Amino acid sequence: MNLTKIQNLTIHNITGIRSNKIIFQNINFSLEKGSLFIIQGSNGSGKTTLLKIISGLLPKSQGDIIINNNFISENYLKDSLFYMDSTPSFKEDITLLDYLIYWNTLYNGLQNISYEYIRTSLFQLGLSHLQNKKISTLSLGQKKRLLISKLLLTNKQLWILDEPLIGLDKYWIKIFSTILLKHCKRGGIIIMSTHTDLNIKKNTFLILNTTNKFIQTLNNLI
């Protein structure tokens, strides 16, 4: 897929409800291709709910998602996005290499498999020496890096990442920041939640809090 398919993405008056309770309301922001958008907030402020609504994994109670100035259905973005959950979930009894081969076949199609590229993604995340080890033997940080390695195998323009930095030390956070910037330079769009300072100059922050009323957007914070 051409990484400039989405020229602009607008979230308009999105409201999230969980267990008949309003978690957040009237969320509004607009992003251009090449944008990195970071969502911050305390536990319970609705970060994961918002990300899943944008991804089409949860229904929105009101509001619109607008792509290239066109209103779209909730499922429209699924073909253009990659969603990463905050909690790694794997088939634990297979090797790292077999897992990525299986995932790549399922996600990208058999004809698109490049075993060399898969091995390269493991190398870039410092996991090549573990490629024949079972996932069950990995630490939390290693599992998170395995999850991140899938970003290097996807051609999706929109990345939606829920707390991707949990379990990473400073060195791997720096490597991950480089991956994010490279994707943005190619015309990608990233929406992610994190409490960690990435020290990336060009980004936008959305601040959520648990009152469901105060929402602040800060452009080019650093």
Curated annotation (Swiss-Prot):
Pfam families: ABC_tran. One of its GO terms (biological process) is cytochrome complex assembly. It catalyses: heme b(in) + ATP + H2O = heme b(out) + ADP + phosphate + H(+). It is an enzyme of class 7 (translocase). It is a peripheral membrane protein. Its EC number is 7.6.2.5. Keywords: ATP-binding, Cytochrome c-type biogenesis, Membrane, Mitochondrion, Nucleotide-binding, Translocase, Transport. The keyword ATP-binding applies. One of its GO terms (cellular component) is mitochondrial membrane. One of its GO terms (molecular function) is ABC-type heme transporter activity. Residues 9-222 form the ABC transporter domain. It is found in: Mitochondrion membrane. ATP binds at G41, S42, N43, G44, S45, G46, K47, T48. The complex is composed of two ATP-binding proteins (CcmA) and two transmembrane proteins (ccmB). Belongs to the ABC transporter superfamily. CcmA exporter (TC 3.A.1.107) family. Part of the ABC transporter complex CcmAB involved in the biogenesis of c-type cytochromes; once thought to export heme, this seems not to be the case, but its exact role is uncertain. Responsible for energy coupling to the transport system. NCBIfam families: ccmA. This is Cytochrome c biogenesis ATP-binding export protein CcmA. It comes from Reclinomonas americana. The gene is CCMA.
